[in-house]
């Protein structure tokens, strides 16, 4: 539920390396 400061509209979350995932076009962590 914490925004990772990255969008995932056109590309996947690069922050997935630290546990972020794409939700509603924005990368979130927990």
From Swiss-Prot:
Protein name in UniProt? Cycloviolacin-H1
Alphabetized, the UniProt keywords read:
Disulfide bond, Knottin, Plant defense
Whose protein is this, by species? Viola hederacea (Australian violet)
Domain topic, free-text comment: The presence of a 'disulfide through disulfide knot' structurally defines this protein as a knottin.
InterPro entries, from UniProt?
Answer: Cyclotide, Cyclotide_bracelet_CS, Cyclotide_sf
Function, as annotated, reads: Probably participates in a plant defense mechanism.
Q: Name one GO biological process term.
A: defense response
Magnesium keyword on record: no
UniProt crosslink position (Cyclopeptide (Gly-Asn)): 1-30
